[in-house]
Structure formats: structure tokens, C-alpha cells
Regions:
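Conserved Helicase C-terminal RecA-like lobe
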Residues: 1-149
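Active-site helix-initiating loop/hinge in glycosyltransferases
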Residues: 61, 159-161
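Conserved helicase core region in the C-terminal RecA-like lobe
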Residues: 149-158
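A short beta-strand element within the Helicase C-terminal
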Residues: 161-167
Length: 167
């Protein structure tokens, strides 16, 4: 099979066996660097917004780290555009969890800009319906009230302004 197909198979197997491989115990054995990242994100000594850069979108980087975060109590930011209107598309059970967002080469330019403005807490730069949804959750995102972690790849590494990022 092709390399991309093998990557998808590996990610599916990781997700299926998340308890074994992506728990803190599994990471201690199979991914100690990922475990340290998880500990840093969960450490109350490091409050506020976190930025994670990786050259890798799938296996070695953002893809696996996304699975690790989901396995360990984080939720992925989900936004959608229906009939031209941007809105949060988070599952009810994910509200209140720490949230991570992706800023990579797989999102549209518009989606990346909306994500960046959510991370920055610049509600006035967002479409009014989405801004109203966010204001009902928090006044801003200065300390990660909406999105705690932004994961970027090289597509997000140049020419963007991020506010209040501490780690």
C-alpha cells in the first residue's frame, strides 16, 4: 500500500489503542518527549496560551500530538461555516475542556484567520454570530479561556501576529 495509506492506518491503530499508547503511562515508554509536552500543558505553573510548532503535520508531529491531547482530556476547536456564517461546532461534552486548535496547511486561509482571531481573543475581528457565541463562554482568550493551545506547522510560522502567548 502507499505511504499515505500506511500513515492513515498507523493513526487509526494509535487512536484505537489510545489507552495503551497515548496515556501518560504509554507515553512514558513510547513517547517521553510527547509526555513532557503534555505535562507542560497541564502544569498550573504555566498558565495562559501555549504555542506548539512542528514541521510535521501527521505522524511525528501535530497529528499524533492531537491524538495525545484528545486522549488526555483536551478537545479540538471545531468551527464550521454554514450558509456563509461561521459558528462554533464543538460537541456539548467538549465545552469546558481545555481546547487546542490547528493552524496548518490543511485549513483554508479564511478558517486559519478565524482560528487565529479566536486564539488572540479579538472577538471584534470575527463575524458577529461567532463573536456572540464566544462572548457567552468568555470575555476574551487572554488565559486560554476558549483555546489554550495553538499548534502550527511551517504554514503558520511566518507573518502572523499572536497575542498573549506565554509558552
Amino acid at each position: 500500500s502507499s505511504y499515505p495509506a500506511r500513515i492513515q492506518t498507523a493513526l487509526k491503530l494509535l487512536k484505537k489503542n489510545a489507552d495503551k499508547y497515548l496515556s501518560p503511562e504509554g507515553l512514558q515508554k513510547y513517547g517521553p518527549k510527547f509526555l513532557q509536552i503534555l505535562k507542560n500543558l497541564q502544569n498550573s505553573d504555566y498558565p495562559g496560551l501555549h504555542l506548539i510548532y512542528s514541521q510535521f503535520r501527521t505522524l511525528e508531529g501535530v497529528g499524533i500530538l492531537s491524538l495525545i491531547l484528545e486522549q488526555n482530556g483536551f478537545a479540538r476547536l471545531k468551527i464550521s461555516k454554514l450558509s456563509g456564517i461561521w459558528a462554533l461546532a464543538m460537541d456539548d461534552e467538549d465545552i469546558g475542556k481545555p481546547v487546542f486548535a490547528l493552524y496548518t496547511g490543511t485549513e483554508t486561509a479564511e478558517e486559519k484567520e478565524v482560528t487565529r482571531n479566536i486564539f488572540n481573543g479579538t472577538w471584534d475581528s470575527l463575524p458577529a454570530p461567532l463573536a456572540d457565541q464566544l462572548r457567552r463562554i468568555a470575555a476574551n482568550n487572554n488565559m486560554g479561556e476558549i483555546v489554550k493551545v495553538l499548534m502550527i506547522t511551517s504554514s503558520g510560522s511566518e507573518g502572523i501576529t499572536l497575542k498573549n502567548t506565554r509558552y
